[in-house]
């Protein structure tokens, strides 16, 4: 395992997350969707549900819960980002949505990921 810059590490982690999501039946709609509120890592369709997915990457074993990785402030930010995306993409406005997390780790044996469906809910 060679040295990766933080940017390169994050990009590789997101690539691996997308690969794992596709294996689990997700259809990737968009990556790195930016707005004035920040950036959504991955937007996907899982069945009829629009999924806003946050990728959390670490060197070493995946440990802890998605709730620990995505605090309340980050959850609110992701909610604002999701709402902005839905407003900009009205075809998806009526579709149900949820927030998933992909916890990605790079270990000596390679990449590992855990997909956490409904990692948090905002109540809207």
UniProtKB/Swiss-Prot annotation:
Instruction: List the GO molecular function terms.
Output: nucleic acid binding
Q: Which Pfam families does the entry link to?
A: UPF0102
Gene3D superfamilies membership: 3.40.1350.10
PANTHER family under this entry?
Answer: UPF0102 PROTEIN YRAN
Similarity remark: Belongs to the UPF0102 family.
**HAMAP family from the UniProt entry:** UPF0102 (MF_00048)
Q: Identify this protein by name.
A: UPF0102 protein Mmc1_3298
Tell me the organism: Magnetococcus marinus (strain ATCC BAA-1437 / JCM 17883 / MC-1)
């Amino acid at each position: 395992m060679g040295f990766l810059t933080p940017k390169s590490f994050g990009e590789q982690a997101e690539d691996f997350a997308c690969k794992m999501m596709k294996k689990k039946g997700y259809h990737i709609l968009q990556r790195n969707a930016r707005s004035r509120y920040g950036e959504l890592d991955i937007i996907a369709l899982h069945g009829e549900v629009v999924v806003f997915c946050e990728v959390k990457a670490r060197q070493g074993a995946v440990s802890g819960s998605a709730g620990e990785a995505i605090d309340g402030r980050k959850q609110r930010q992701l909610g604002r980002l999701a709402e902005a995306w839905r407003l900009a993409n009205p075809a998806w406005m009526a579709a149900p949505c949820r927030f998933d997390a992909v916890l990605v780790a790079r270990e000596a044996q390679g990449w590992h990921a855990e997909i956490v469906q409904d990692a948090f809910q905002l109540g809207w």
